[in-house]
Amino acid sequence: MLSGTDKHGFAVLRSSPLPELEAVMHYMRHERTGLELVWIERAEANRTFGIAFPTLPEDDTGVFHILEHSVLCGSELYRVKEPFVELMKTSMNTFLNAMTFPDKTYYPISSRNSKDFINLMRVYLDAVFRPLIYEKSEIFRQEGWHYELAEDGTLSRKGVVYNEMRGAFADADELEEDAIMRALYPDTPYRFVSGGDPEHIPELTYERFLDFHRRFYSPSNAYVYLDGDVDIDEVLGILDGEYLSGFAAGERIPVPELQRPVRAGEQRVVYELPAEEDPRERYRLAWGRVAGEITDRVRMTAMQLLCNVLCGNNQSVLTREMLAAGLGEAVSMMLWDGCAQPFIKLEVRNISEDKLARAGEKLRAVLGGLAENGLDRRELEAAMANLEFQMRERDFGYYPQGLGISFGVLDSWLHGGEPEALVEVGTLFDTLRARMEEGYFEELIRSVLLENPHACEVVMVPSHTAGEERRERDAKELERLAASWSEAERGRVRSQQAALDAWQGSSDSPEALAALPRLELSDISPEPEEYPTRADELGGVTLLRHELPASGISYVSLYFDITGLGGEETAAVSFLSELLGKVDTAEHPAQELSRLTQLHCGNMSFSVDVYDNSADSYRAKLTARVSALESGIGEALGLLAEVLRSSRLDSEKEVTDILRQKRTGMMQQLMNNGHVSAIGRAGSQLAAGPAANEWANGYDYYCWLKRQNAAPDFAALSGELAALAKRVIGRRGLTVSVTGMPCPAVDEAVAALLAALPEGESVSGPGIAARGVRREGIEIPSDVGYAAMGALGGEFDGRWQLAGRVVSLEYLWNAVRVQGGAYGTGMVTRVNGFDGCYSYRDPSAAKTLGIYEKVPEFLRAFAASGADIAGLITGAISAGEPLLTARAKGEEADDLYFRGITHEMRRERRAQMLAGTNADLAAVAEELESIFARPGVCVLAPRAELGRCALDEISTL
């Protein structure tokens, strides 16, 4: 296909086989502009395209983050306000987004539909090279920042990125890592916050914003990535004929020079703490250590392994020593590899100020001893086995595999390395095992962690008042600024505000919308993807088999029924799931168990999961999951049986350490994913399943952890956990799921596992009921909030799925995100009948609740308009069928099984969507009008905003 050296103006520089992917990587350069391109040619139906630009910040205004948002707000060919949203509405994409990194901006898409893939690629190319930002300053003001003058003269700032970063800066981890990068890279672009510091975002002018696009978004500074079964002749023809031929060669932004070593000393950063938290034990100590260069793969992988061996869990050698000494609640170590010179962050979390010095001394003493006396070779071998499994598995979770691979390609390519250098595993671990015998890892401890001339320390200082002081400071600055303006300046701001309001409130013309490429409904299969499931019985236990190619890996899940438990017991089982695999068993101490698990398992995890298909019933499961190579599944399931059968729950130190860590982690999770917390909490007022999930994974579980931590009675807790383990872990009520290809060794291992388990007891009881409708608020330390409102609707079907998509993208996106300044928003429609709306990083939660109340009115008017909804149908179907790995397909099949959703039911819902009409939407609007009369409400926000939400009750995180 690529014979010859020139194709549509592209010279093929070389082609390199990638046997692990059964692929060939072609490396090309566009001769006229210098644009570089790689294509991983392989038989992969999910095609990926991405275009990346090295974007090196020169200040903290977040200009490249704002550009990332803004170029997707209209272009020369696609002159609609938000092509990105139109694509969300109308495409069958498996990925559609854009990303700002500290030194690059990346615009990737993927799709299983070849026509859709080309459509998406065209829109993205026009967006980055020909955006409407030069014609429409309103784009900058909407996505970046702008002033707003209220009728009473009160001045405020708004903007999507501005509010996003206000929320990000409520995260202590974000503040800590920003401080480390400022300290370690004082002479490079990495010292700046690429996402933007809210204090500095308002310093960015429209003119400077445009200048950065001119300088950095040229074909000569672009890198294109392709993966999969791509029609390369068509793609190169589009690139050259429609875009690159119109550009001359320009300047390629050089790779930034490496930072010379600096000893930055100690930095102190204040962060906001929830009001009920005692600040005395909430200091953090973080070491920042530059680890080398990102293109040095052996060294970077070795540092990942060191992170695991030293601090991978509570039994890892450095963490264990620190916790035993009472120095910190948790100790972690990670490789931060999003830059040319990755750094190690070694953190001791939740410690008193008077112990900071001792913590630093203890870290040095333990690391010094390890460097001198050597690491446990068995621990290193286990860590290598586990990391090699993960790297060869290439399961990137939310990201499609082609996109996940692209991150490694760009890491090497944009920093002067070969694009294929980080793609395959090859002999990497053979090299590391050989170097292990030469003392390589001990030398890294010395050179990177102990004697590194390129280092800093950051102390995070907790404060109850920091957030309020900042908000008062901002308010006074805005008040002073407004008072200093002349009437002409006020008029200019009001004029810009009016222009922005008019633009945001305007509709795209039919001609502009028609120009956007889109699929026809006839391009969409009426058949949803089927997840193969065969239900068998083995030893009285239900066995679900999902026969799927999985590269020689088996995925085994055990589901122990806990449906009848009450709230307190469900929370205790959820905490039990945190302990399993982390505490001693009758056969092995926790440290040895951890080593064996890493050696023999790709993954071993435990959780509590809730499945429902109606408002008044649900199924709750204690879930155990294991993945391993088929050849090693016997050892893996043997370890799982040991953990389930004989975990020791009576070790006070280990259990209370995990309790405190989980409580802190849950607090951070509730703040960072407040929209999930809010919508889940609202749903729990109305339906039993969400109420059970609150006790298993939500705010009720967090409150249970707080109570256990505040008034510890270890004997009672240990006794309850042991009694629950005996009650729920057994063959009675158990369902086992196996995903992978048929394999006798797997069948034998599963049979042996079941034989090793006790019979168990029946878990009976009334379970957990819905909490009852109310308007509740949870105070969080943040400048932005998360608002949710919902109600129980009629029977879930394809009409409701379509209506949720229409409300999300035709109404909430514009009203809450575009005009309201929230970073995210949407409507969910769930199989249990719950229908609700949420917002994310929202500066005006109270106003947003009012917008939700008008959803029925909007939907009724939309249906009456007779709008063409074919594209929205396409997008709704796509949203319900994401790209899944074999592992994820098995888990989705289990989910459907427990909810009682058959393939025929899914086919019927798809048929309902494909046949959807405005009359269907009108019918849903009438139902929404009725159910939204008394909805459930939950808002997570700062205290002042909660006071504007007319709430019945307020608690504090």
Predicted regions and their residues:
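Non-catalytic terminal extensions that flank enzyme cores
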Residues: M1-T48
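A conserved hydrophobic secondary-structure block that centers on an alpha-helix together
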Residues: C73-G74, G196-A222
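M16 family metallopeptidases and their MPP-like homologs
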Residues: N46-L56, E82-R130, S137-E148, E174-E199, ...
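Non-catalytic, conformational "gating/processing" segments within enzyme and secreted inhibitor domains
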Residues: K158, L210-E242, L717-A752
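Active-site His/Glu-centered metal-binding helix of metallohydrolases
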Residues: V63, L67-V71, L576
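His/Glu-based metal-binding/catalytic segments typifying zinc-dependent metallopeptidases
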Residues: E41-A43, G50-A52, Y162, R166, ...
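Long, compositionally biased intrinsically disordered regions
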Residues: E443-E530, R681-E779, R910-A911, A915, ...
